[in-house]
Design a protein with these regions (language model features):
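Short beta-strand elements bearing conserved aromatic residues within extracellular beta-rich modules
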Residues: 69-71, 107
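Structural beta-strand segments of beta-rich domains
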Residues: 55-59
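The feature marks proteins involved in alpha-glucan
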Residues: 1-54, 86-170, 175-183, 192
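Short proline/glycine-enriched turn/loop motifs at strand-loop junctions of beta-rich domains
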Residues: 62-69
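Substrate-binding/active-site clefts of carbohydrate-active enzymes
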Residues: 150-163, 172-347
Length: 347
């Protein structure tokens, strides 16, 4: 597969005009610009779509500093010249419909910067990601899962969590238990872990499990705290549907599910969010605010409406689409204090 970044040069030109594909409307663009489009994950990213009678996938990405954007994947031999994307109206969102694509296709966005360099980036809104060390996004369809946790959800809606007793078992699925098998490094799948973990948690008297590092991340040693795929349950343990099975199973056994959530910082990996379109986009441009000295990571630019929208929509995504019962926010202090991890004169 193509590497995550390239130094290929390309002559740039003005953005082409397009009428759009009818997915992202004027209201969507307005709410996104205001930072209030809390279901934006239904619009950006990759989604099954039917256009003019043809089934395929719709792709959309926000890249305001890009000179051009195209889609690459196995379907076009990772050729950045093969499948160009077009901006929606006069916005900074690029879109494309590709007929014939289905679930399980590897893809990235090839973003041409204004210096002519082409960056191969994973989709920030992808629902699924390639198993590491691969770094591509993977087309998925998260619509079809049949939940049967209605009893739990109804009880949750009528309960004040602040007043209810709670006892939490914090667990990292990748190291809690492993199997003696070569496939996927012996990891339990979400489905396999569900039954054993639920039985243990019930036996020990816990009310909730708190899962560490579920969003996609490239480096095992980070335990999931350096995220590159905020909308993708890590493929180490299975698919998005299988993670829904995990949550559903826990709820049926009377166990709540809390996720560790990492909106404080993100890694510098070339395929990820850092310098996404050739410039600081998701991170602060000023390195005094945009770089975390302790962890060597980037700090989200919370002042940008589109970035805060990305994070708020992500929090709601896990709650609405995966029925999780709460989020434990990681590294809050580093988000609150400009001098966090910095010496006098460094901020």
């Amino acid at each position: 597969m193509k590497k995550a970044a390239s130094t290929t040069k390309r002559t740039t030109s003005k953005k082409p005009k397009t009428e759009g594909l009818g997915v992202i409307g004027e209201l969507d663009r307005y709410l996104f610009g205001e930072g209030r489009h809390y279901q934006l994950y239904h619009k950006l990213g990759a989604h099954p779509y039917t256009y003019r009678g043809q089934d395929g996938y719709y792709f959309a990405v926000w890249a305001p500093h890009a000179a051009a954007v195209s889609l690459v994947g196995d379907f076009n031999a990772w050729n950045p010249d093969a499948t160009p994307m077009k901006p929606v109206a006069d916005s900074d969102i690029y879109e494309l419909f590709v007929p014939g694509l289905g679930v399980g296709q590897l893809y990235k966005f090839a973003i041409t910067t204004h210096t002519g360099t082409i960056l191969f980036k994973a989709d920030p809104y992808a629902f699924s990601a390639e198993y590491r060390p691969g770094t591509a996004s993977v087309t998925a369809d998260i619509r079809g899962f049949k939940w049967n946790d209605s009893k739990w959800m109804e009880s949750r809606a009528g309960t004040d969590p602040v007043k209810a007793p709670i006892s939490i078992y914090e667990v990292h699925l990748g190291s809690w238990k492993k199997k003696n098998r070569p496939e996927k490094d012996g990891y339990y799948t979400y489905k396999e872990a569900a039954a054993e973990l639920a039985a243990y948690v019930k036996e020990m008297g816990y009310t909730h499990v708190e899962l560490m590092g579920i969003a996609e991340h490239p480096y095992d040693g980070s335990w999931g705290y350096q995220v590159t795929g905020y909308y993708a349950p890590t493929s180490r343990y299975g698919t998005p549907e299988e993670f829904k099975y995990f949550v559903n199973y826990m709820h049926k056994k009377g166990i709540g599910v809390i996720l560790d959530w990492v909106p404080a910082h993100f890694p510098r990996d070339a395929h990820g969010l850092a310098d996404f379109d050739g410039q600081a986009l998701f991170e602060y441009a000023d390195p005094r605010k945009g770089e975390h000295p302790d962890w060597g990571t980037k700090v989200f630019d919370y002042e940008k409406h589109e970035v805060s929208n990305f994070l708020i929509a992500n929090a709601l995504y896990w709650i609405e689409q995966f029925h999780v019962d709460g989020l434990r926010v990681d590294a809050v202090a580093s988000m609150l204090y400009l001098d966090y991890g910095r010496k006098d004169g460094e901020w």
